[in-house]
Amino acid sequence: IQLHPDEKDPYCLQIFESLSYEANSEFEQAPSTCYQHSKPDYAQNPNTLFDHSVPTQWQCLNYTDKRSIEMSGRLFGGCLDTVGLLLDSPFLALHEFKKHNASQGIVLYLESAELTPATVARFLLSLKLAGMFDDINGVIIGRHVTLQGQDPGFDYRQGLNAAFGGCLFPVIIDADIGHIPPNLNLINGALCTITADVEQGKVTNSSVVTKLA
């Protein structure tokens, strides 16, 4: 995230607000109206502010019928480019985190910065085979515009379907997470409840409530 002092984006400002919250505080977030498609050169133009011009539309990967969904638990996640490389290392202790928080469960969040669709699929399948998707309550995945159309023989959604096809828990994609602003303020280890309505794969009336407990 580019934290420019003149930036008025509420998602940016939420980061600083959350730093002042006391234990057991709650805050609620909702999907953005629009996101930024362009990639400014901050080295050449360091005072560039966000330009949110493309309509945001969260999607549900595995539910297309009309229904309400909810996922709740402790947040755990990060950038897939890094998480995938930490698999089976002591620095990705998800199994221990699951055991410690078994009563609340886990909401996993992921996004990718520079991976191709095929690499996204490989990383996700590696995590799946390692049991990372076992006994979790849901997944929320950030958008990555540069992946669209990057490989004409294998697109981004195919990669996600390869890993999450058949999963019973909700899988929300194209969310406000990652390297394409704006970004939700997700805090590892915090309790989170995500509710939404789904119809024809589109997500509406979304709410992300985080509790610092």
At which residue positions do the language-model features occur?
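Conserved anion/nucleotide-ligand pocket segment
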Residues: 1-81
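Predominant activation on well-ordered alpha-helical scaffold segments within soluble catalytic domains
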Residues: 17, 80-88, 121-124, 157, ...
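Generic secondary-structure signature for well-ordered alpha-helical cores
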Residues: 17-29, 85-92, 129, 165, ...
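Intrinsically disordered, low-complexity coil segments
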Residues: 26, 63-70, 95-102, 197-202
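Short acidic (Asp/Glu) and glycine-rich catalytic loops that position anionic groups and cofactors
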Residues: 57-63, 103-104, 137-143
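Glycine-rich phosphate/diphosphate-binding loops and the adjacent beta-loop-alpha structural elements
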Residues: 65-70, 107-114, 140-147
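Oxyanion-binding "anion nests"
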Residues: 74-120
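C-terminal active-site/capping subdomain that shapes the small-molecule cofactor and substrate pocket
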Residues: 116-213
